[in-house]
Design a protein with these regions (language model features):
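Sec-dependent N-terminal signal peptides
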Residues: 3-13
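Catalytic glycan-binding domains that act on GlcNAc-containing polysaccharides
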Residues: 17-161
Length: 161
């Protein structure tokens, strides 16, 4: 019960975007990735903004889905989309989804969890998988893991209080 209450408090920004916290719980159950880790990654990647877009390294935070769709229609292949910032150029085609499909929060979190679980298995560890979720470059992995770890630790601290 405490975990649910903490997740609810931590996810108030998510609810503000009209996103159900249940998405993260469901994706966690389906993928085996701890819900706290999914939340930490989403926090680092998008600040829980389901419309967040990264265009070749430049973050954009549209205020609506309509605005996000317009940006995506004009974007190239190197674009990260949504709560989990799924890279369409790498994963969209492999998984058979469009850029606009990735704006669906349920699909985005589920795919992000699926991708992360593949990296965790391939790299034989949670944090190695987290680093690779972000980049194949070791230095970028270390920086990313540090950011996710800080967010993850804050979530765990709230859960344990």
């Amino acid at each position: 019960m405490r975990l649910v209450l903490v997740l609810f408090v931590f996810l108030l920004p998510v609810k503000g975007w009209g996103v159900s916290p249940e998405i993260f719980l469901h994706a966690s159950r389906e993928s085996g990735i701890p819900v706290e880790l999914l939340l930490a990654i989403s926090h680092v990647e998008s600040r829980f903004n389901p419309h967040a877009i990264n265009l070749s390294g430049r973050s954009v935070f549209p205020s609506s889905r309509v605005e996000a769709e317009g940006i995506l229609k004009r974007s190239g292949d190197n674009v990260d989309v949504g709560l989990m910032q799924v890279n369409w150029g790498v994963w969209g085609r492999k998984l058979g989804v469009s850029k606009l499909d990735l704006l669906d929060s349920n699909l985005n979190v589920f795919l992000g969890a699926k991708i992360l679980s593949q990296y965790v298995r391939a790299r034989n560890g949670w944090w190695q998988g987290v680093g690779f979720y972000h980049s194949p470059t070791p230095e970028r992995q270390r920086e990313y893991v540090d950011r996710v770890w800080r967010s993850y630790s804050r979530i765990l601290f709230r859960v344990r209080d």
